[in-house]
């Protein structure tokens, strides 16, 4: 294998250079190499974090319903099924989500990625809004994505609960989900999420058993809220901290909540 072609489990350096001018849609449309040819970067992570907002209708056909299992469904086939009224319902920008899905479905880099292990759960009484999904990038590398806060009241309540409670129900669910995925899939993992999903990614990576944690190569938190000091002082957090890549848009509100000992980069962001 040539030196400039990373192996199947490769991830680009923790502080990659900014991509060429443009946005996520431009990137998805422009990048042609598969993950076997070029490792995952922060922009790939952000795209996959957005895909965690996907909702699957209860009456979905057999192909799309396969997303809930471990054989999964290709991103391109999700788009082809055309459940456009359901996919990003409740997201703060359904139109942007659909545009990004269309770009991913047409992208040689993303269209054959298999989407597996989709789960979502809302419990009003427990003030829990949780969803997660896993993307099989190569035979040796999977991206575990946690959904951020949606437009529901319970979702926002759980966000505010982060300011005085740890763990909240979704953090517990995230750690269990990541451990379950690791028991089902071989290879290494990158874990990430947008908004609250970024917080869940960090918590899960720090909380799984050591043999699972050793398989996690990177943790991405895109505008994710921070943590209470009690969590940041634990050995579990210290172990995962060097692998955390946290980015905040200049206009960040959610990502500046609580302690910021994870370290972060500020990026310009005003469009998809």
Language-model segments: what does each one mean?
Residues 192-197, 201:
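Gly/Ala-rich beta-loop-alpha elbow adjacent to hydrolase catalytic centers
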Residues 2-43, 48-61, 66-142, 146-188, ...:
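Alpha/beta hydrolase fold serine-hydrolase catalytic domain that processes acyl esters and thioesters
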